[in-house]
């Protein structure tokens, strides 16, 4: 895989069942709930993240909340694409180039679910999209090198899913499912 060039926007996204976090250059750009507010009468998306919660509490008879990610997997493509588009626009306000995105994923996702996530990220505005096991993303986020001969066990404990992985010499061992 070609390494990121310095001229492009580089974004890392951790989209969990509860929270979505977006990083760039070791900085947290966004930390919001992974939730979409939907108008019950029109089925239109009317808010995302914190704004979705506020909209729901202002009119619970008209607004319902939808969580597009459950148990570490995308359960609704339309809402996932909508929330990703909104969050990317929010963090890339003035950017001229579309970003290259690395999305952390649960180790148990099927190939169909992986392709659907790549498609959603591309439609949300990515120039390129890559998937990285969440256990690897957690270790790299802590500054741990995964290409050394040392054995590293990394664990990510989320709301619905706990992922772990073992790394050594750049190789990754996924748990059996």
What do the PLM-derived regions correspond to, one by one?
Residues 1-159, 165-177:
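Nucleotide/phosphate-binding catalytic cleft detector across ATP-hydrolyzing
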